Protein backbone atom coordinates (compact mmCIF):
# COMPACT_ATOMS: atom_id res chain seq x y z
CA UNK A 1 0.00 0.00 0.00
CA UNK A 2 2.97 2.31 -0.11
CA UNK A 3 4.80 4.30 2.52
CA UNK A 4 1.99 5.32 4.84
CA UNK A 5 -0.40 2.38 4.56
CA UNK A 6 -4.13 2.21 4.99
CA UNK A 7 -4.03 3.35 8.63
CA UNK A 8 -2.00 6.41 7.70
CA UNK A 9 -4.45 7.34 4.94
CA UNK A 10 -7.35 6.92 7.36
CA UNK A 11 -5.67 9.19 9.90
CA UNK A 12 -4.94 11.82 7.23
CA UNK A 13 -8.58 11.74 6.10
CA UNK A 14 -9.77 12.20 9.70
CA UNK A 15 -7.39 15.12 10.20
CA UNK A 16 -8.57 16.69 6.94
CA UNK A 17 -12.22 16.30 7.92
CA UNK A 18 -11.47 17.82 11.33
CA UNK A 19 -9.77 20.80 9.73
CA UNK A 20 -12.86 21.39 7.56
CA UNK A 21 -15.46 20.50 10.16
CA UNK A 22 -14.30 22.63 13.10
CA UNK A 23 -14.62 26.02 11.32
CA UNK A 24 -17.96 24.90 9.84
CA UNK A 25 -19.30 24.13 13.33
CA UNK A 26 -18.28 27.57 14.60
CA UNK A 27 -19.82 29.17 11.49
CA UNK A 28 -23.11 27.34 12.09
CA UNK A 29 -23.09 28.37 15.75
CA UNK A 30 -22.70 32.01 14.66
CA UNK A 31 -25.62 31.70 12.22
CA UNK A 32 -27.76 30.02 14.87
CA UNK A 33 -26.94 32.70 17.45
CA UNK A 34 -27.82 35.49 15.00
CA UNK A 35 -31.18 33.87 14.28
CA UNK A 36 -31.89 33.31 17.98
CA UNK A 37 -31.32 37.01 18.64
CA UNK A 38 -34.18 37.83 16.29
CA UNK A 39 -37.66 37.86 17.79
CA UNK A 40 -39.53 34.63 16.99
CA UNK A 41 -41.98 36.48 14.73
CA UNK A 42 -39.03 37.79 12.68
CA UNK A 43 -37.26 34.43 12.29
CA UNK A 44 -37.93 33.40 8.71
CA UNK A 45 -36.23 30.08 9.48
CA UNK A 46 -35.67 28.12 12.65
CA UNK A 47 -32.25 28.71 14.25
CA UNK A 48 -31.73 24.94 14.33
CA UNK A 49 -32.11 24.76 10.54
CA UNK A 50 -28.63 26.29 10.24
CA UNK A 51 -27.27 22.85 11.18
CA UNK A 52 -28.38 21.51 7.79
CA UNK A 53 -25.20 23.17 6.48
CA UNK A 54 -23.25 20.25 7.95
CA UNK A 55 -24.73 17.78 5.42
CA UNK A 56 -22.28 17.27 2.53
CA UNK A 57 -23.58 18.06 -0.99
CA UNK A 58 -26.96 19.20 0.41
CA UNK A 59 -25.15 22.21 1.88
CA UNK A 60 -24.36 23.41 -1.65
CA UNK A 61 -28.05 24.25 -2.09
CA UNK A 62 -28.85 24.96 1.57
CA UNK A 63 -26.27 27.74 1.64
CA UNK A 64 -28.49 29.79 -0.67
CA UNK A 65 -31.50 29.17 1.59
CA UNK A 66 -29.53 30.06 4.72
CA UNK A 67 -28.20 33.31 3.23
CA UNK A 68 -31.57 34.53 1.94
CA UNK A 69 -33.50 33.53 5.06
CA UNK A 70 -30.84 35.05 7.34
CA UNK A 71 -31.02 38.33 5.39
CA UNK A 72 -34.82 38.40 5.67
CA UNK A 73 -34.76 37.62 9.39
CA UNK A 74 -32.14 40.26 10.14
CA UNK A 75 -33.88 42.88 8.00
CA UNK A 76 -37.18 42.28 9.79
CA UNK A 77 -35.54 42.37 13.24
CA UNK A 78 -33.61 45.56 12.51
CA UNK A 79 -36.82 47.16 11.20
CA UNK A 80 -38.67 46.13 14.38
CA UNK A 81 -35.94 47.68 16.52
CA UNK A 82 -35.76 50.72 14.23
CA UNK A 83 -32.04 50.21 13.68
CA UNK A 84 -30.90 51.50 10.28
CA UNK A 85 -29.26 48.78 8.21
CA UNK A 86 -28.58 47.99 4.57
CA UNK A 87 -31.40 46.22 2.71
CA UNK A 88 -31.13 42.41 2.99
CA UNK A 89 -28.16 42.52 5.39
CA UNK A 90 -25.32 40.26 4.33
CA UNK A 91 -27.19 38.81 1.36
CA UNK A 92 -24.87 40.02 -1.41
CA UNK A 93 -21.63 38.70 0.10
CA UNK A 94 -23.42 35.52 1.19
CA UNK A 95 -24.74 34.83 -2.30
CA UNK A 96 -21.29 35.55 -3.74
CA UNK A 97 -19.89 32.90 -1.37
CA UNK A 98 -22.50 30.33 -2.44
CA UNK A 99 -22.03 31.00 -6.15
CA UNK A 100 -18.24 30.85 -5.89
CA UNK A 101 -18.45 27.51 -4.07
CA UNK A 102 -20.42 26.10 -7.01
CA UNK A 103 -18.02 27.68 -9.51
CA UNK A 104 -15.24 25.84 -7.70
CA UNK A 105 -16.37 22.67 -9.51
CA UNK A 106 -15.66 24.20 -12.94
CA UNK A 107 -12.37 22.95 -14.40
CA UNK A 108 -9.66 25.64 -14.65
CA UNK A 109 -11.75 28.07 -12.59
CA UNK A 110 -11.88 25.78 -9.58
CA UNK A 111 -8.89 26.89 -7.52
CA UNK A 112 -9.35 30.67 -7.94
CA UNK A 113 -13.08 30.33 -7.25
CA UNK A 114 -12.51 28.23 -4.13
CA UNK A 115 -10.02 30.80 -2.82
CA UNK A 116 -12.49 33.62 -3.55
CA UNK A 117 -15.28 31.56 -1.92
CA UNK A 118 -13.18 31.16 1.21
CA UNK A 119 -12.63 34.93 1.39
CA UNK A 120 -16.35 35.62 0.85
CA UNK A 121 -17.28 32.98 3.45
CA UNK A 122 -15.07 34.64 6.05
CA UNK A 123 -16.42 38.11 5.16
CA UNK A 124 -20.00 36.82 5.39
CA UNK A 125 -19.28 35.14 8.71
CA UNK A 126 -17.76 38.34 10.15
CA UNK A 127 -20.64 40.44 8.81
CA UNK A 128 -23.30 38.19 10.37
CA UNK A 129 -21.35 38.09 13.64
CA UNK A 130 -21.36 41.91 13.61
CA UNK A 131 -25.11 42.04 13.03
CA UNK A 132 -25.56 39.48 15.81
CA UNK A 133 -23.48 41.62 18.18
CA UNK A 134 -25.66 44.63 17.33
CA UNK A 135 -28.75 42.59 18.18
CA UNK A 136 -27.16 41.44 21.45
CA UNK A 137 -27.00 45.01 22.72
CA UNK A 138 -29.71 45.78 25.28
CA UNK A 139 -32.99 46.53 23.59
CA UNK A 140 -33.80 50.18 24.12
CA UNK A 141 -37.38 51.16 24.73
CA UNK A 142 -38.79 51.53 21.26
CA UNK A 143 -40.44 54.89 20.64
CA UNK A 144 -44.14 54.60 19.92
CA UNK A 145 -45.17 55.70 16.43
CA UNK A 146 -46.93 59.05 16.32
CA UNK A 147 -50.56 58.56 15.33
Predicted feature locations:
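Short hydrophobic membrane-inserting alpha-helices and related fusion/pore-forming segments
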Residues: 13-18, 56-59, 103-114
Amino acid sequence: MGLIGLTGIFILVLIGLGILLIPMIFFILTMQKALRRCAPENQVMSPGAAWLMIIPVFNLAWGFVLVTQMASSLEREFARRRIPVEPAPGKSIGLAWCILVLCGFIPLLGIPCVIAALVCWILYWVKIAGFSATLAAPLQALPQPVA
